[in-house]
Amino acid sequence: MAQSFTGKKRIRKSFGRIPEAVQMPNLIEVQRSSYEQFLQRETRPGLRRDEGVEAVFKSVFPIKDFNERAVLEYVSYEFEEPKYDVEECIQRDMTFAAPLKVKLRLIVFETEEETGARSVKDIKEQDVYMGDIPLMTDKGTFIVNGTERVIVSQMHRSPGVFFDHDKGKTHASGKLLFAARVIPYRGSWLDFEFDAKDIVYVRIDRRRKLPATTFLYALGMDGEEILTTFYDVVPFEKRSGGWATPYKPERWRGVKPEFPLVDADTGEEVAPAGTKITARQAKKFADGGLKTLLLAPEALTGRYLARDAVNMATGEIYAEAGDELDVTSIQALADQGFSTIDVLDIDHVTVGAYMRNTLRVDKNAIREDALFDIYRVMRPGEPPTVEAAEAMFKSLFFDAERYDLSSVGRVKMNMRLEQDVSDEVRILRKEDVLAVLKVLVGLRDGRGEIDDIDNLGNRRVRSVGELLENQYRVGLLRMERAIKERMSSVDIDTVMPHDLINAKPAAAAVREFFGSSQLSQFMDQTNPLSEITHKRRLSALGPGGLTRERAGFEVRDVHPTHYGRICPIETPEGPNIGLINSLATHARVNKYGFIESPYRRVKDGKPQDEVVYMSAMEESKHVIAQSNIKVAEGEIVEDLVPGRINGEPTLLQKETVDLMDVSPRQVVSVAAALIPFLENDDANRALMGSNMQRQAVPLVQSDAPLVGTGMEAVVARDSGAVVIAKRTGVVEQIDGTRIVIRATEETDPARSGVDIYRMSKFQRSNQSTCINQRPLVKVGDRIVAGDIIADGPSTELGELALGRNALVAFMPWNGYNFEDSILISERIVRDDVFTSIHIEEFEVMARDTKLGPEEITRDIPNVGEEALRNLDEAGIVAIGAEVQPGDILVGKVTPKGESPMTPEEKLLRAIFGEKASDVRDTSLRLPPGVAGTIVDVRVFNRHGVDKDERALAIERAEIDRLGKDRDDEFAILNRNISGRLKELLIGKVALSGPKGLSRGEITAEGLAQVASGLWWQIALEDEKAMGELESLRRLFDENRKRLDRRFEDKVDKLQRGDELPPGVMKMVKVFVAVKRKLQPGDKMAGRHGNKGVISRILPIEDMPFLADGTHVDVVLNPLGVPSRMNVGQIFETHLGWACANLGKQITNLLEDWQQGGQKQALVERLTEIYGPDEELPDTEEGLVELARNLGKGVPIATPVFDGARMDDIEGHLEMAGVNKSGQSILFDGLTGEQFKRPVTVGYIYMLKLHHLVDDKIHARSIGPYSLVTQQPLGGKAQFGGQRFGEMEVWALEAYGAAYTLQEMLTVKSDDVAGRTKVYESIVRGDDTFEAGIPESFNVLVKEMRSLGLNVELENS
């Protein structure tokens, strides 16, 4: 297997046995592709598909004015370049967005007065600015007001038709009441439902119900048409001796006739009355030639007429369609000369009379009445007119502007109703309504199945593009009303398109969506995994989705169709469980929004290379085998293989299988696929494990896990945390902040031949963790496009590294690991093993106040020189300064209100001018609990405000950096082009040239005599070569101009003032890096849900140690394993132990070789570990680097559901030369004695979680009080106190601690006068106090008085 640049440096051995049939898709493709479909930025205007922005404009335009004198048409749109790039937007608190320009065409008509004919009078086209649309960064995020945000995809019920029943809950009898619901993408919902009496009703938008036939009348049907649509018609012909009817076997199966069946043609009795006719007999009668039955007249009683019985001559109606026949009415019809009576084929067993009964219940009989009824339900209180009712009914379901099923809805409807209608037809049709009612009635008759709404075939995903499209449509519709009004109010002949358009509503809708939608979330940026997971999240909440309170158990539960689409493990614990999910590793979203999973085709028991993606609906028709079935020589080995049909697990014959899974990890999400031995963990703990990995803090020095799953490199690559080479090339220059690579395979002359990659250094993430990138390459390295050239936070050598490998022993230690507590060695603190850096951001603004402008200055009243030691002349803290809580970061003074002055002050003021006392100190100080180093300061000035010295210094440094980038890129470009020019010139004949170059054939020596900048002056004899020289010259000049232009643009942006909030003159941001070592109270966890809090840090010498004197790092409680059933951690411990010991062996072999031993021993050991198929480095340098990187341990991958087995682990332990049981003899560090029995010791990958005790610990002496109750506020953020609640009061009462209780309830809480006095007495050195009345008592008295109860205190 070909290794990547970083993969060669440390090869990870995999235990996976199942080959991957398909490469894992890019993990943030969901976000990227959805937004690209929305914007279609790269597609030329004429070629754009009808989706996204294009679809929105086409649906809103053309806009006509009220008199139809003018039409505003949409032509096309294009995006301009964004004003600021991503970095600048983050620094300046701006939105990364591109201006949208739309080309509109205004057509003005004129009408001839005589003929009324319309002709085009004028056509005007113009580009109109329609606001800014935020752009997605390469990482799938949006920068909104300077913060990175993610738009989470939403799961909602797919548009279409759904059939369901009430599970017998509505009616006391437990009868199932069936219902059908037509859900459009936008528009009114249409419900059909049965009641307990089997009458079918219709509801529009969940309003009052009407008989379903009212809706059919409104569609233009009449009673007879309704009946013949829903029921077959059976003709009965009058003959002597009874009525004859055609014989159909299926109608008589299982029937016990009350009268004899007689063959109408022969007159002989076929079946006697009262005997049951079996299916075989019914078929036998037909085979015997029975075509017509003669039935007694009583056979017609209870049947329903199919058509009106009308006397054609007089028009008299004897009976109406749907009337029930009895003996008298049959006789009457016969007497009137009706020789044939058509009745409905209703037997009340297989076909019920529901629609006929509904028709009878319906009071309406004509269309107008039905329309009026619907109008009254939809708009109660308004008197209906025929036109209004007609228009309202049409707009509900048959108007494309108001009702949209969407292509998804039409496709779903076609599948459910077995129709074939184009997905362009997005409104309801009469046929759809009838088909829905037929299926509903069929369900009531026992035919067909109801739908499962939790099936992923009935739920779809709305990603970023679609969510924003809907929001933008809302904005444009708001704009449309304004445009119509403006078109009517202005002189249409002189106006231009941009005069009609105010783009604010559209821009506001987009801004509102990104700023305040429930689905637009502040990105979880704790580590690269949490970023990826956030982008792959699916939420059932949000606008148009579910709410936590209403979501039942079924919606949250795992469904068989989740297999390979949604992870069954990763979901939050708590109220959102099951409502927020994660996409499975291989899943993707198709054009209709359904989640698809990949499968390999299988033909005749042979797996094929072809991979197909299937949605839950398509998959239900297939027989699918698992990916772990044995395949030898391209054929499935076993005859019976495990698999599933329609989601149900079963054993399958290999010949029946037509699909198989592509990979065992396709079932789970990215986070769950990072847990080794996931198959050995209980699901609840696996859930915690996958959730806690997202909370791991990036450490100062990360280690990739010894025991991984092979997903680590994929996650690091796709997360955007590492730097990836865009093009193949050679590393030219490198330092800690940037890498310069010269592209070697670039053919496009318009593109630069140089790539400069800037490292992020100590940047603050959304969660205040530290983003820091480190180069992995050195000058001269050859890089291939796609290689990882720099590590980011929580990555090491291009692999995800969330924590560190720690030497762990499972044993109790003096009670310090009670209840999951963790005992750690002081070595971990000393060597900064779990030390992390957190960057806090503080900002201060100088505003223009009513009393005068605030000022950022070093000159602060009543502050000593000691407090100003870290500030520069401008009053801003210096970078690199060590700061403690309470230190001044930025000095600021605010003007005070004028107070009356004494005569002395007036005199002094007159003598010395302005005095310092009319300003107060409002400096930015470091809050309690934060101490660290200043890593960055940014100063922002308003336009037209003079920059201070500090702002100018920052600006100069930035310009120098940009200049260096430009110069380096130019130097490489110059070298590159000079090389090509030299190749072109050597061997050619020069006609003329610069001074120092002789005519004739050009040689390398001759060229060396002339400066390369003058080579352009050479004139060649060969015209073709001269043409090439000219094109090279042009390329060189263009590239130089491009570099200069880019540099000038950037400098111009720097020197221009910043856009600050209103009233702000200047803003300073200070970034403080805080180093957090591990300490008691910090939370740690493994990857298997094994979490705990550090209880004690023990001196190294007191920790238990191994026979070779190595002290363990961590002691965990063995009782944490059995009840929690996460045995994966024990497997990990054993395998980690084997890996580490193999690493020691390799280090020893490397040392032997470097001290004159044999290289072969090392190579043989590596081959034994990795197997003969693994490519080892072919150079000695590469081999040494690999061996050094393996010194800490040989990293292995044990993929989920396809990992190392018991015998693999034992084999590795043997190979590593340690006990096969994985247990070791340990000695007590305190006494030096051996423990009684062997202890499980090994390496576990431990994470430090973002629940640090430093962020939680908090103390208050005096602080802010609540306005009404005068009690201290609560919480660390408010600098609040600790609540002394009801139960705590009981405790003090129980102990009889009266004085303590009194001071808790009065002077320490809300006795305002008392607490002031206590403060004064403490200052005087007096320790007595007197308690007064708590303020909350006064609040209670006021409350009671507001209820009219007078409560007064009587002093007795």
From Swiss-Prot:
InterPro entries given for it? DNA-dir_RNA_pol_bsu_ext_1_sf, DNA-dir_RNA_pol_bsu_external_1, DNA-dir_RNA_pol_su2, DNA-dir_RNAP_su2_dom, DNA-dir_RNAP_su2_hyb_sf, RNA_pol_bsu_bac, RNA_pol_bsu_CS, RNA_pol_bsu_protrusion
Which top-level enzyme class is recorded in the Swiss-Prot or TrEMBL entry?
Answer: transferase
One of the protein's GO biological processes:
DNA-templated transcription
Q: Which reaction does it catalyse?
A: RNA(n) + a ribonucleoside 5'-triphosphate = RNA(n+1) + diphosphate
Identify the keywords attached in UniProt to this record, alphabetized. DNA-directed RNA polymerase, Nucleotidyltransferase, Transcription, Transferase
PANTHER family cross-referenced by the UniProt entry: DNA-DIRECTED RNA POLYMERASE I SUBUNIT 2
Q: What does this protein do?
A: DNA-dependent RNA polymerase catalyzes the transcription of DNA into RNA using the four ribonucleoside triphosphates as substrates.
- Similarity field: Belongs to the RNA polymerase beta chain family.
Question: Self-association or partners: how does it assemble?
Answer: The RNAP catalytic core consists of 2 alpha, 1 beta, 1 beta' and 1 omega subunit. When a sigma factor is associated with the core the holoenzyme is formed, which can initiate transcription.
| Protein name per Swiss-Prot or TrEMBL | DNA-directed RNA polymerase subunit beta
Q: Which organism is it from?
A: Caulobacter vibrioides (strain NA1000 / CB15N)
Give the gene symbol: rpoB
